[in-house]
């Protein structure tokens, strides 16, 4: 058998199997123009998981660090919801569709995804360095402008600036990362691969919340700097060594097309079929369900007397539970289809959150339902990861995935400040977040029934084929 190699492109390396003793052929896996031996597949998985671990350390750490610092400098719930929810959602609406379609159409020597992952990476790390030094910059800015008194307004302003820069650059990588997986991982392994992805992400979450979050208030600068360096090195190495295949030419560009004509065509292509419209709404509601608890769980914990370090331990415990069940969930998704497994997980999550609204009354019961929230929403996330490549057309995966993300973030953009305002009016009655997440989950399950009927009409779990893109139908 040949030595472990990265995938070979079938146009330049026609052989798809390596000889093994006894005259048989080694098993291979293919996706697009890429063909993997066992060794090549293992190497791909290791590289992608290493990149995902670095990416997850960024995703799992920066958000809670920023939450802690916003509370430390006395940001209101409304301001927190704007910075943590609405502004990132607005940026997603503006950036994600443009970058994803641009990536779908890109043809370069490095592929169509890697350039959009590698180039923003140092900028993301730089924004994290800016967040690390925001308190010092805020104090310096106050002195420069001749301000007096508490510098928290200046510090929060600098935090907001670097947070927005961080979100802009991170959004570019987020918009195409799953596209890289879609283009390089064989379909027959997608459920188990995403389970491994989930395990890497959870491992990053366990490490951060068990070991580092307790230092968020006292050593935030050092934590930011370490994570920035780790992300810069780890994600860059993945971009350097993962190889994409070759792609067919993109559809021709319409000459003299105006900006608004391009927007109109984007929405026509994504929404031309009822199945896709139901897909976008159902998946967006499913992703929206945990948002209320996610945004305010740390503040809710503090309202029950739970300190940041203990909150981190609860979060780490929930990630350990999720880690243990991730691969079995991936196997179940491959065996019974992500459509079935993900909907079951969402139904259980919705009922549990509704129960939490009625039963949480002290620190212990909050801990139980908070851990349940994290584990069950994670179960849905793990089970649904393999669903996206199955319900969106592969050639335009980035575009269709961005349409789902656009709708989801539009909902977050509108809902986050309303939620923050309601919590401010209620006197910070954080128990409401369980009712809201549970209610959105119930609505998702109801809508999923209609979506599943459309899915069955298109071939179901045995032979579903995504409806043809509009250009193919025309």
Where are these regions (language model features)?
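Juxtamembrane intracellular "pre-TM" segments in multi-pass secondary transporters
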Residues: 16-40, 247-279, 466-474
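Multi-pass alpha-helical transporter architecture, strongest
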Residues: 131-138, 233-242, 437-469
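Structural signature of the two symmetry-related core transmembrane helices
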Residues: 113-130, 340-355
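Helix-to-loop junctions at the C-terminal end of transmembrane segments
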Residues: 94-110, 216, 325-338, 423-424
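A membrane-interface helix-boundary motif in multi-pass transporters
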Residues: 112-115, 149-150, 214-229, 421-441
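Intracellular juxtamembrane helix-capping segments at the cytosolic ends
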Residues: 66, 172-185, 379-393
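Helix-loop boundary and gating motifs at the non-cytosolic
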Residues: 23-91, 275-304
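Glycine-rich segments within core transmembrane alpha-helices of 12-TM secondary carriers
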Residues: 88-93, 191-213, 405-416
